[in-house]
C-alpha cells in the first residue's frame, strides 16, 4: 500500500518542479517582452523583476495583464504564445499549491 506521507511528498516535488517551470517561462517571457514591447517591459519593471529591489506593484501588473488575457491584442505572435503558456502554467501551479495545502491539512487531521 502507498504511504500517504510519501504521496504527499511526491505531490510537493511535483509542485516545486512546476513552480520552477513557471518561473523559467516567466523569465523567457520577459526576454521576449524586452525585444517586442519595450514600453510594456518598462511598465512591468522587467529589468528588476527577479531582483530584491523589484517593485511588487509593477510585478502584479504583469500577473493581471496575463490573467485578464489582455495580451490577445498584442502584435507579436510569439509573445501571445508565451503568455498563453505562462497563463496555463500559472493556473496549474496554483491548483497544485492549493492541493498541497489541502493535503497537508488532511494529513494533520488524519495523523
UniProtKB/Swiss-Prot annotation:
Primary location group: membrane
InterPro entries given in the database record: Universal_stress_protein_B
Membrane topology term: Multi-pass membrane protein
Transmembrane segments: 1-21, 90-110
Keywords: Cell inner membrane, Cell membrane, Membrane, Transmembrane, Transmembrane helix
Location relative to the cell: Cell inner membrane
GO cellular component: plasma membrane
Family recorded in the similarity comment: Belongs to the universal stress protein B family.
The protein's name: Universal stress protein B
Organism field: Enterobacter sp. (strain 638)
